[in-house]
Amino acid sequence: MLWDLKLKVGHSSRTIADCLRLGREDITIRTALLEHRFLAGAADLAYTLATRLTSELFRKTGAEFIEAKLAERAARHQRQGGQRYVLEPNVKEGKGGLRDLQTLYWIAKYIHGVKSPADLVDRGLFTREEFDTFSAAEDFLWAVRCHLHLIAGRASDVLSFDMQVEVARRMGFE
């Protein structure tokens, strides 16, 4: 159904052994496994996967994960020009964009086992104000990105000059 709606859906079908093996070999796959979710089927199998990922893949590899994610971030920033303040930002991949927020959350989830960014407050990792700022930034960037996609009629992550006025208008800015 999701494909019929022309939605891009990340998915894979693997055994638990394959998940563990591939997760050890590839940090991108490991990150995807960190974000896995049960949709339908054998709930006991999903529980076994989650338990084994935590005990056999995530536990005791936090430093390795952080190092890899920070290296990915540095490479991504370099590809985007390395600038924080740009006139036509990439809202997904640029400095301060959605991927930076996701990276921060993925690291917290990996290290502390949180289920949502709100859990960071309960764990004392974010103050309520920091969480509110994080959430507002994430909501804003997602809204900008969704408007870019709707206006362009395709995936588009660069807030170019020709898109800025229309995105601002749609978001209620004068």
Task: Give each language-model segment a name.
Residues M1-E174:
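A nucleotide- and high-energy phosphate-metabolite-utilizing enzyme signature
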